[in-house]
Amino acid sequence: MTIKNFQNNNDWSELLVSVRRVTTVTKGGRRFSFSILVVVGDEKGRVGCGMGKHAEVAEARIKAVNAAKKSMIRVYLREGRTLHHDIKAKFCSGEIVLRAARAGTGIIAGGAIRSVFEVLGIKDVVAKSTRSNNPHNVICAVFKAFDNMLSPRQVASKRGKKISEVVGNR
């Protein structure tokens, strides 16, 4: 479910990843609420994820979208369509492998990972999720991988080389 929002002249794309009904058991009985996981992006390299909990689904969604916009990160893309290099990441029990792909490959990913790539604007990528299929753990692992990812400029400065030497013949 993709929803486009036009706020502050920015084109945000929201994708609802999961909706769960959760229960709090109290002395007086059970209290039900909804927990929503949302991914928000501009399809140009910025993405964020957020969770929201409330007794009503609409209010939980608003909270989740606001949390996602606050947690936005910038991901540097190669040619505006794929990742610069392959990367592995782990969060709790969720492990993922993200691989850069040739033009025309498409998004080869399942479940929650696909939603992150769609709102991020990645066109060609291969991703594999192992061990856990919990959407929250998988998405957090993807964001951890994005945090560990280096742009060619960062790699070149670490190695003391020019960017053209690092990028080479791709």
From Swiss-Prot:
It comes from the Bacteria. Signal peptide: none annotated. SUPFAM superfamilies: dsRNA-binding domain-like, Ribosomal protein S5 domain 2-like. GO terms for molecular function: rRNA binding; structural constituent of ribosome. GO terms for biological process: translation. It holds the Pfam family Ribosomal_S5. InterPro entries: Ribosomal_Su5_D2-typ_SF, Ribosomal_uS5, Ribosomal_uS5_bac-type, Ribosomal_uS5_C, Ribosomal_uS5_N, Ribosomal_uS5_N_CS, Ribsml_uS5_D2-typ_fold_subgr. One of its GO terms (cellular component) is small ribosomal subunit. PROSITE patterns: RIBOSOMAL_S5 (PS00585), S5_DSRBD (PS50881). Keywords: Ribonucleoprotein, Ribosomal protein, RNA-binding, rRNA-binding. The keyword RNA-binding applies. Belongs to the universal ribosomal protein uS5 family. With S4 and S12 plays an important role in translational accuracy. Located at the back of the 30S subunit body where it stabilizes the conformation of the head with respect to the body. Part of the 30S ribosomal subunit. Contacts proteins S4 and S8. NCBIfam families: rpsE_bact (TIGR01021). The N-terminal domain interacts with the head of the 30S subunit; the C-terminal domain interacts with the body and contacts protein S4. The interaction surface between S4 and S5 is involved in control of translational fidelity. This is Small ribosomal subunit protein uS5. It comes from Wolbachia sp. subsp. Brugia malayi (strain TRS).
